[in-house]
Design a protein with these regions (language model features):
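Conserved phosphate-binding/catalytic region of the ribokinase-like
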Residues: 1-12, 154-158, 205, 209-246
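Glycine-rich phosphate/adenosyl-contacting loop at the front of the ribokinase-like
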Residues: 2-78
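Short beta-strand segments
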Residues: 13-15, 105-108, 133-135, 166, ...
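Glycine/charged-rich beta-loop-alpha catalytic/anionic-binding loops adjacent to active sites
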Residues: 21-30, 134, 240-246
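Residues that scaffold the ATP/ADP-binding catalytic core of kinase and kinase-like folds
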Residues: 21-22, 105, 130, 203, ...
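Conserved N-terminal subdomain of the carbohydrate kinase-like
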Residues: 52-137
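Conserved beta-alpha-beta core of the PfkB/ribokinase-like small-molecule kinase fold
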Residues: 131, 137-214, 221, 231-233
Length: 246
C-alpha cells in the first residue's frame, strides 16, 4: 500500500524516518514526541525553500507511521512513494539526557524502512526526478535497504538524474571497513557529495581540507560540500573552491 499526494517531485530522497522520544528533563520519566530521519529532514527543509520534494521509504501500518505521513503532508512533501508495510512497525528512538550528555537508543530492527528492498523502488519516479538524495544511513540500516539505495543511485545515473549523497556515518549501524567500502562505491556515482568533517576524516584517514576534497573529487563527484560545523562549509569543484560561512 502507498499513500498518494498530487505532486511531481523534482527532488526524491530515499531513507529512513523515525519517531523520536526526547527526554524532557534529566532524570524525569517524561519524553516529548518528535520526528527524526536525516533524509526526511532534508526533504522537509528543501520543501520549505520552495522545492518540490518527495520521500521514498516505508512506514508501518501503525499510529506512528500515520504521524509521519501527516508530517510530510503538512510540509508539502510528496508521499506517493511511501509504502505502508502491514507486517512491520515504524522505527522509534529515545534521547536521554545525563551528566555525560545525550544518549540515543534506537528500536529499528525489523522496522518497515529496514525491510525496504530493490523491488520496492519506484523506478519511474526516480527516472523522472531531477535529483535523488541519499545518505550513509540509507545504506546502513539493513542489507536490503543498502541494495535498494545502490540500485536507486544506479537507476538515477542511467537516466541522467543527479545524485546527492550525505555521508552521515553511524558506526553503531555497521563496521568501519564495510562503511568505507560501500560509501566509496556510492560516492563514485555521486554528483554532489555532502560529507561532514568527522565522517570524512574517519572514512579516509586524511586530515587536510584540500587533500580531503581532492580525494573525493577524484572519485567522481562534481561538487563537494565539506561541512565544517560552526565554521561553515568548504565548497569545491574541479575549477573552484570557497568557504561559505556558517
Amino acid at each position: 500500500m502507498t499513500v498518494n499526494t498530487p505532486a511531481n517531485p523534482d527532488i526524491l530522497a530515499l531513507g529512513e524516518a523515525m519517531i523520536e522520544f526526547n527526554q524532557s528533563a534529566k532524570g524525569e520519566p517524561k519524553y516529548l514526541q518528535g520526528f527524526g530521519g536525516d533524509t526526511s529532514n532534508f526533504c522537509i527543509a528543501a520543501a520549505r525553500q520552495g522545492a518540490r520534494t518527495g520521500f521514498v521509504s516505508a512506514v508501518g501500518a501503525d499510529h506512528f507511521g500515520r504521524l509521519l505521513i501527516d508530517l510530510w503532508e503538512r510540509e508539502n512533501v510528496d508521499t506517493a512513494q511511501v509504502r505502508v508495510d502491514p507486517q512491520a512497525s515504524t522505527g522509534v528512538y529515545f534521547v536521554s539526557h545525563g551528566p555525560d550528555g545525550h544518549a540515543f537508543d534506537y528500536l529499528r530492527a525489523g522496522s518497515a524502512a529496514s525491510r525496504y528492498a530493490p523491488h520496492d523502488l519506484p523506478l519511474d519516479a526516480i527516472a523522472a526526478a531531477k535529483v535523488v538524495h541519499l545518505s550513509g544511513i540509507s545504506l546502513a540500516i539493513s542489507l536490503s535497504a543498502c541494495d535498494a539505495a545502490l540500485e536507486a543511485i544506479a537507476h538515477a545515473r542511467a537516466n541522467g538524474v543527479r545524485v546527492s549523497f550525505d555521508t552521515n556515518l553511524r558506526l553503531k549501524l555497521w563496521p568501519l571497513n564495510r562503511a568505507r567500502a560501500v560509501m566509496l562505491e556510492a560516492i563514485r556515482q555521486t554528483d554532489i557529495c555532502l560529507p561532514s568533517w568527522d565522517d570524512v576524516t574517519e572514512l579516509t584517514g586524511l586530515t587536510g581540507r584540500d587533500e580531503i576534497v581532492d580525494f573525493l573529487l577524484s572519485h567522481g563527484p562534481r561538487v563537494v560540500a565539506l561541512k565544517l560545523g560552526k565554521d561553515g562549509s568548504y565548497i569545491a569543484t574541479p575549477d573552484e573552491r570557497r568557504v561559505v560561512p556558517g
